[in-house]
Amino acid sequence: MSKSHLLKYLLISPNLPVGGFCYSEGLESYLNTKDLKDSNSVKELIISELKIGQIRLDARLLLDFFDIFNELNEDKNFKNNLQKLLSLDKWILSSKDSVEMRAQQIQMANSLFDLNKEFGFEYLYKKNKKNSWPLAWSWSCYCFEITKLEMVETFLYAWSANQLSAALRIIPIGSTKAQLIQRDLLEIISKVSREIMDKEIDDIYFGNVGLAMAQQNHNELYTKLFRN
């Protein structure tokens, strides 16, 4: 088995700087409105986001970035591909509904680019001043020679694990319950990942505005909870 199969765990390990990020992404607002009260409601929220949330668009964009990296590496249509890369990166970052979410994306991307550099995979191309998390994730997977399906799966797994880590602190749901939820999410993560692999960006539907609205009310709360 290729070591690239194991390198993906560097990206999702909660003990490393990348996986160690713990952002609540609006969960406190749900908690305050009593929409988030136990492990079942947490599980339902995460499943809803995986099925119709914006995280699907982020995951789909990983594939476009990955393909562009291949083209750039082979020096095919270099100027056009680089411009497309920069435009997509700026677009997905600007699509975030709150200043806090954009700041989260930028911080996580910068940290992952720094980690990649330490691994010997410094980013080779021109970047925007502010970069998106999907761009950094795709670059890591490209450098680690992780398959595109595994790239999407680990991205969604890491996102869901992050939400559960936040829920552990703010509800709390208990670590055993969180593990059970993560286990139950594996099937939906696998299904959604394969669906995304078969779709173009324009075919990705997302319509869950609840979390987006909640995110705009959570900046002070998550700062208190997760600054350390």
Curated annotation (Swiss-Prot):
- The gene name reads ureF
InterPro entries under this entry? UreF, UreF_sf
- Keyword Cytoplasm assigned: yes
What this protein is called in its record is Urease accessory protein UreF
Quote the cellular component terms of the Gene Ontology held in the record: cytoplasm
Subunit structure, interactors included: UreD, UreF and UreG form a complex that acts as a GTP-hydrolysis-dependent molecular chaperone, activating the urease apoprotein by helping to assemble the nickel containing metallocenter of UreC. The UreE protein probably delivers the nickel.
Write out the annotated subcellular location.
Cytoplasm
Q: Name one Pfam family in it.
A: UreF
